[in-house]
Every structure is written in structure tokens, then in C-alpha cells.
Amino acid sequence: RDQPRSRGLGDVYKRQICHSFAEDGRCISLLKIMLTNYCIYDCAYCINRRSNDIPRATLSVSELVDLTIEFYRRNYIEGLFLSSGVVRNPDYTMERLVRVAKDLRLVHKFNGYIHLKSIPGASRELVNEAGLYADRLSVNIEIPKEENLKLLAPEKDHKSVYQPMRYIQQGVLTNKEDRKKFRHVPRFVPAGQSTQMIVGATTESDKDILYLSSSLYQHPTMRRVYYSGYISVNTYDKRLPALKQPPLVRENRLYQADWLLRFYQFKVEEIVDDSYPDLDLEIDPKLGWALRHPELFPIDINQADYEMILRVPGIGIKSARQIIASRRFSKLGFYELKKIGVVMKKAQYFITCNELPTRTVNELTPTGVRRLLVPKPKKKVDERQLILNFTDNE
């Protein structure tokens, strides 16, 4: 428990409470907790690997259920995010995870959100049972390429990950057909499934990662791929890169590219290719694409179709829809676009309208626009240097 004097307005009550966003934009507080940090696997990138000499603990099913209910009653949380290290075997661990969700739903009539981590290698029966009580199931791919997974986690393979993914997908599709025939059939994993990849622990390029993500999104039940910048926890293992800090900028760029794939109708080959296998860390992927294709710009904001407006840097989905709706009544200028929410600092170089000057990407060149939009690096000041500020008031 935190010391009372260290807690103030807005402090999270427990470190185990995390925040997730629902598809409708709501922020949900979740109790993020592990059943146990014991594990039979010795994955090089994991702090809970078998060979690590760290404190270990295991919660019983009843302890987890009681903890969740108490937090829920006190309005600390709106749901549970439950994962676990693998003890004994995948089925044994998965059975305990299912029991937690089952007891919450059936015994305590818990109607909050439940996200369960499905254990790779668990049986179809247990995955199907978990889907009856969980809102979302996830199976983590962890390392995008199997040869690199084998290098860092020799006891694992991608087959054990993709198999439960297929179980979940088949369960959702079967449930959808059953609900057409019978009204009272319980829903199966209504929030779909997700997965996660570790970024920076191995040699995969952003191109490799995004092509894998794109193929996963072809499956109707895959709602989200998460990217986690590698945190250097086992520095003694020579198979791992020596990173001073997690690649957070790269992680953010992957999320931006992922957003373009899911909502902006981009294809992977438009974002990364053989010439540009990694995302630019200085600019976002949409701006990067626009600067590589100056021949497509500028576009007339009062005439262009929705799909092309979406591709303009500084214009999001909501703004694009408002532009289409608003221009039916009058022509849009600088003031109207800014009021709609367009980031004119970026967009002005890629669009034309009545009031904008003609300093577009074609006049300034992509290099010139990039120079204007990339923030200048701040000069580092030697902390040992004494700085004297002289003002007229002294």
C-alpha cells in the first residue's frame, strides 16, 4: 500500500490498476494481475523466466476472485485483466484461469469486463470454455519470426500460438451462427481477440512486423495487435540487444502505422517497402508517405473525395467526415478547416482552398517541408556549467 502522504488527487490506488480503452472510446480501469509468476519456460526476454532468481508468488483462485470483487465493489476497477506464468503445463494453468472467470460470472454474478490471456498450447475445450466467460481472449505472438522466437525461447513455437487463435476464431463464428437460430445462446468472446509483439528484442524490421499485423487483421475476430518496446530486463543474456532504454518512439510509430492499416485504408507496401523497411522515427508514417508521393498533392479540399482527404497529413477520420459534410453548404477556407480540427501546421502544404497560399509541397519540395515540420533538436546544456541570467531589472 502507498504511504498516505505520498498519495494525492488523481493518484492510482494500486500499481496493478491499468487503463484500457473500449472501442467506443471509454476508458476502463482494470485490475491487471498474474495468477502466478512461476514459469516452466526460460524465455530470454522475460523477467519471470525459470532461471531467474526472483521472489515468486501464486494466488489461489478464491484469492483472485475475492480481490476482484472487493476492488469492484469499492469502485476501484471496472474489470479484470488476468494473465499467468505457465506452471506444470499449459492446460493446468489455463484451467485455473478459466475457474477464476467462471466463479466471477456464475457465483458472484460479476458483469464487469474480463480479459483473459489464453495460454499457448492449451486444449481446445479449455479455450472454448474461457470464451464463454471472458469478454476478450488474447494469445501473445511475442516474437514476429519463428526463427528468432526459437533463438530466445527454444521451448516455444508459433504453432502453439496460432492454434488457440484458430480455436477462438472458430468459436466466435460458430457462436454467431448459433445466435441466429437461438436467441438465448450466450455470447462467445464478444470483444474478440488480441495479441502482442515485442519490438526491438530481435532483428525484425518494421516491414516484417506490419506485414504480420496486416495478415492477422484479415481474420474477422482479431481486434487489436499491440506492440511493446523491449525492456532490457535480463542484461546478462548475450542473445539480447544491449538497449539503454526501450524503443518507445519506434513503438509509437508502429501504433500509428497500425492505425493507418485499420482505419485509413492504407496498405503495408504504401507505408514500408524494400527501400524503406523501417518507419521514420522523426516523422509519422502518414507524413512520410505524403512526402514520398508529392505528385499526388496538393488536393483541393473542396473537391477531393473522402479517401484522398483521409491521406492528407493533419486530417483525421472525424475531420475528414466533417469536411465532406460541411462543404455541401459552402466552400471551406483556412478558418473553417481549423475550426473543424484540421492540424493546419501539417495540412497546409498538401491542400488548396480559397485562402491558403500556394506554398505547397511542390513549391517547397519534400525536403523543405520535412525541414519545416521536424522539430529541431534541443541543445544539451552541461549541468556543470554556471549560467548567469542578466536582466534590466537587476
Please describe what each predicted stretch is:
Residues 145, 160-237, 246-272:
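Conserved C-terminal portion of the radical SAM core fold
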